[in-house]
Design a protein with these regions (language model features):
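Acidic/proline-rich low-complexity IDRs
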Residues: 6, 26-29, 90, 218
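N-terminal type II signal-anchor transmembrane helix
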Residues: 8-55
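Structural motif marking the loop-to-transmembrane transition
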Residues: 16-21, 189, 193, 197-200
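A transmembrane-helix-recognition feature enriched in membrane-embedded lipid enzymes
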Residues: 193-215
Length: 225
């Protein structure tokens, strides 16, 4: 009897460990499935809506330029910033849109994505009167929801890199905004690999936001464009 009791006591921790291994393996599998489904869904739905030629972009919509930092981590000019400015200016000068809504981060002192992008667009010949700033576009999800709920836009042309545009277009679809996108030039090499991994995770976070229809960090009063 004593020997059997000792075996039971020794066996219990093993069963618990096996149980936790199963739980952890299940959670990891669900996480991987969520990442894969989110990415496949976004890429599939946005197919044919991301344009590289201004002639294929629908006319008359407000262009939503998604913000990014003017400077990189080492203080150099951020290529993504330059490429997005070039794309937004090109789109404007093509006559496809008469207004540009710049949505970016301005939550800390000395960091102002919308202002930096406005100044760069003005330097490219875009009139200041055609530019509207959204200082609370802390995330792509926030930018898309605020474009509709705060700035009253039901149709948009999103301007950013292709991988970013895909996610923005899917968010637009889910919140009831008709949208196409104009792809800015992208980078190549190791940076692209790192951003691809980050984008996979961002799309998973997006799926959670859309599942619960979270509100942006800030909404506030409506602003007419």
């Amino acid at each position: 009897m004593k020997s059997k009791s000792r075996l039971n006591r020794k066996g219990t921790p093993r069963r618990k460990r096996r149980k936790w291994k199963v739980v952890i393996a299940t959670l990891l599998a669900l996480a991987v499935i969520t990442v894969i489904v989110s990415n496949v869904t976004v890429s599939h739905w946005s197919r044919g809506r991301c344009h590289t030629n201004t002639e294929n972009v629908p006319s008359g919509r407000v262009a939503l330029l998604l913000g990014t930092s003017r400077l990189g981590r080492h203080g150099n000019l951020n290529p993504y910033f330059v490429y997005r400015i070039d794309a937004a200016a090109k789109l404007y000068h093509s006559g496809k849109n008469r207004k540009i809504l710049i949505s970016g981060d301005n939550r800390r002192k000395g960091y102002n994505e919308p202002e930096d992008m406005r100044n760069a667009l003005i330097a490219k010949g875009v009139p200041d009167s055609c530019i509207v700033l959204d200082y609370a576009g802390f995330r792509t999800y926030d930018s898309m929801v605020r474009a509709k709920k705060v700035f009253g836009q039901d149709s948009l042309i999103v301007v950013s890199q292709h991988w970013h545009n895909e996610r923005a277009l899917y968010i637009a679809h889910r919140i009831g905004v008709e949208a196409d996108a104009f792809d800015a030039k992208d980078r190549t090499g190791f940076t692209t690999i790192r951003l691809t991994v980050r984008e996979w995770l961002a799309r998973t976070k997006m799926a959670i936001d859309l599942l619960f229809m979270h509100d942006p960090h800030f909404l506030g009063e409506k602003i007419e464009i």
